[in-house]
Amino acid sequence: MGGRGLSHAEALWLGMIQGLTEFFPVSSSGHLVIFRSIFGIQGTGGLLFEVAVHVATLLAIAIYYRGRIASLVVGVLSRQPDALHYVGMLALGTLPAVLVGLSARGFIERQFENPAFTGFALLVTGGILWTTRRTAPRAREELSRGRPGVLDWRVALWVGCGQALAILPGISRSGTTVAVALALGLAPAAAAEFSFLLGIIAISGAAVLTFPDLAGASPQQISGLVYGSATALVAGLAALWAFVRMLEGGRFYLFAAYVWVVGSLFLLWTLLTGG
């Protein structure tokens, strides 16, 4: 992991961007690429810094859903069928991201240095979010009629495929997984919960894969990881609280306009500057 590493100010800004954008469906990874490209920040550690601040937002998820996580742990230990089923679906939903992450790590890392790819991916994210304009109201209507969607192996696997796609910068993990879950009939609150709990496993796995890279990191680079992660944790807690309430309000699809504008402007910037 070569390069000069991040200054404290750069790490704080990038950590804040990560924390604020991780839980809104606008692609935190895409915003990190945009910030680095426009402000000319180099030698940031690329995927390593990305995973470090993701671990911080993972802690935010664990804190926010601590009650649900505790009940699942107790349920699994006491072999309660509902808890065992839910954890099994989390494991199944994790498989696609594991397979993609292990088999295409080199390609994925290169895309973090490819601004044009990120701009295009943001446009794709906008299209995914726009589909919830119809699927979210339908899911809420089914819930009101006492017919909530069922979290079965098909739902878990398709949501997992959405998470695997979102490894790429510019594709929103929360946006894609929640959109897929809504399309398959899960209620908004259930879709958000499964999406974020699924993220705990995937992010933990990505962190483990990058731990060996820390051996070659300089003290300045390690310092940048610490500053960025701390900021991401605080910002992530605030953003997660706001996200859940906005999702329940049924305005999820409005984020599509934001990512379309940002993606288009960033693509234009890459064309004018050579990216």
Regions found by a protein language model. Name each.
Residues 1-275:
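Multi-pass membrane proteins that catalyze or facilitate reactions on polyprenyl-/lipid-phosphate substrates
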